[in-house]
A protein has these predicted regions:
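Short Gly/Thr/Asp-enriched flexible loops that form oxyanion-binding sites at enzyme active sites
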Residues: 17-36, 63-64
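A generic local secondary-structure boundary/capping motif
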Residues: 8-9, 40, 85
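Phosphate-binding and adjacent anionic-ligand microenvironments
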Residues: 45-163
Length: 163
């Protein structure tokens, strides 16, 4: 991005279902914000006054706070693309995704797609004369730590009984 004096940059994973975005300063925005930027552009384009978006439980609350500010709501699903899609179908939601950079737009198809996400982020960027870093900074700022905890040897049923 910096070498080419680009306004923004994109990186996709090997099977192209997730997208990471880089601003004009060469700063990765974090894949959590791919979905937030997509929802921002979606709301602006369609003039949505209230809608339901779906994300999984492993997604930061930045999307929830942004949606609430725009009279919209976020419903959560279990982790996994199929769980997000099933919840979208149940709620008749048009847009969902995961905090891993995966965006799902019903209008295109019910699966994560980095090209859909690229289009939606470019749409959001085109709605403003501000650089992407300023658009990003205007969004609710939250971080999420994703880690695994080893529970070998712990009997989960017994653990919850004692609490």
């Amino acid at each position: 991005v910096l070498e080419n004096n680009a306004d923004l940059g994109f990186a996709v994973d090997p099977d192209a279902d997730r997208l990471a975005v880089v601003d004009e300063k060469g700063r990765p925005l974090g894949e959590e914000y791919t979905l937030v930027l997509s929802v921002d552009g979606y709301i602006n384009t369609l003039g949505v006054e209230s809608d339901i978006f779906v994300s999984n439980l492993s997604t930061s609350i930045a999307l929830d706070k942004f949606a609430l500010k725009n009279n919209c709501k976020v419903e959560r699903s279990a982790v996994g693309e199929i769980n997000v899609v099933n919840k979208m179908n149940k709620l008749d939601s048009n847009l969902g995704g995961e905090g891993n950079g995966g965006v799902i737009l019903r209008e295109c198809h019910l699966g994560r797609d980095s090209l859909v996400a690229v289009t939606m982020v470019l749409n959001r960027a085109a709605q403003s004369t501000s650089p992407l870093s300023e658009i990003y900074n205007s969004l609710p700022q939250f971080e999420i730590v994703k880690d695994k905890v080893n529970v070998d040897g712990i009997k989960i049923d017994d653990f919850f009984k004692s609490k």
